[in-house]
Amino acid sequence: MRITTVNPYSQEKLGEYEEYDDNRLNGILSGLKEAQREWEKDIDRRIDYFRSVLKPNLSKRRNELAKLITEEMGKPITQSLSEIDKCIKLVDYAINDYPHYLEPQTIKTEGKKTYVRFDPLGTVLLIMPWNFPLWQVMRGAVPAMLAGNAIVLKHASIVTGTSLMIEEIFSSELFRSVIVSGSRVGKLIQKVEGVSLTGSSGAGKSVAQEAGKHLKKVVLELGGSDPFIVLKSANVHEASENAVFARMQNNGQSCIASKRFIVHEDIFEEFADEIAGKFANVKVGDPLDKSTFLGPLSSMDQTKTVRSQIENLSGMGKVSSFGQYSGGIVPPTIAQISGKFEEEVFGPVAILTRFRTDQEAIALANDTPFGLGASIWGHSDEAERIVPEIEAGMVFVNKIVTSDPRVPFGGVKQSGIGRELSKFGTREFTNIKTVWIDH
């Protein structure tokens, strides 16, 4: 099977790649397992690798990789560069902070010595999406490799070139990218010790089912339909300013993008007017132009899906689009509705609805199968009081939801299982081993 990558803005063909056959895959997996046996023995070696190999390689190839990311999946070039810079910061955390999370933890008991150690599992399969093609990989690979695991990456086919460049940047016998179709992922799952998937809820269920057959450890970071709650006490100007990036970052294709804007009725019109004015002034166009804020969606299939969702929203309320459809570009769009819309819209579409009471806002926020992130805007004490009632893995007050190496990332409900980053993510792909020495 041949895989072809296409520029979603120009529709030009970028490259063609051959799928790896079973012999090549088996050779790669055997090499990873052999290398991992030595890798797990020395954390100082692992830290030195991040410091002397991975970080310099990311910096050296920053511009080249950013351009390829933008060409393959349409992200504005300024955001591609920012994504790489964020990955470099993650490596710094892996060098300076994450090793402490892997130190044995002493527990006081009646025995002579009792402690918990964190041993690697072996080889971890990363099944990654196209929307943040470097950050998603780094978020999974760096903590797992620091813990002593090897990594095999199965990336989304539309970013195959990026996947191979990432392998070059890692430049390690502990990290390999493979080109395989989705139908063959099951065979890979059988041959590794852990699986981390970022993708849709449907993909997560399929991978969890396959992993369950073989009792493989899984971490699933899945879809989201994050609420952006604007309380009566909110600074409307601040909230609307942040709403633009919260909804349209990465051309609206982010699992943690704010998608449902739940606004107090007393300030609803003011907020709606402000966000409409800002949406109307967004620079749309060539993602390689540094002044562009909104580029094309990742593929024509994705464009068709979002356009269909906008048509469905038109039957539920007032829909306003600010610009023209052109190729893969979907213009900034606002839908004011009174009912609920359960689908995750992976494009620059803001769904606005109003509420009267805090309990109504909470009910609207939770009325979704997803539970990834949520942001609340208003007086911090008032906002914090409703945090426990929000069904989400992450709640940010007066800040848009983001992934940060210092805090755990992940969701509940249909948004996933497990956590990435921080102490919790670093330990996900470890054998948490109890050691009790009685005398």
Where would I find each of the regions flagged by the language model?
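Rossmann-like NAD(P) dinucleotide-binding subdomain of oxidoreductase/dehydrogenase enzymes
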Residues: 107-238, 355
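Residue-level signal for inorganic ion chemistry
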Residues: 11, 46, 69, 91, ...
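N-terminal Rossmann-like NAD(P)+-binding subdomain of aldehyde/semialdehyde dehydrogenases
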Residues: 1-112
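ALDH superfamily catalytic-core signature
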Residues: 1, 14, 194, 202-337, ...
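Conserved C-terminal structural/oligomerization subdomain of aldehyde/semialdehyde dehydrogenase
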Residues: 10-16, 326-439
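Short, well-ordered beta-strand elements within core beta-sheets of diverse protein domains
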Residues: 15-20, 34-40, 126, 228-230, ...
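Residues at or immediately preceding the N-termini of alpha-helices
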Residues: 8, 22-25, 43-44, 62, ...
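Structural signal for hydrophobic packing residues in well-ordered secondary-structure cores
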Residues: 36-40, 58-62, 66, 73, ...
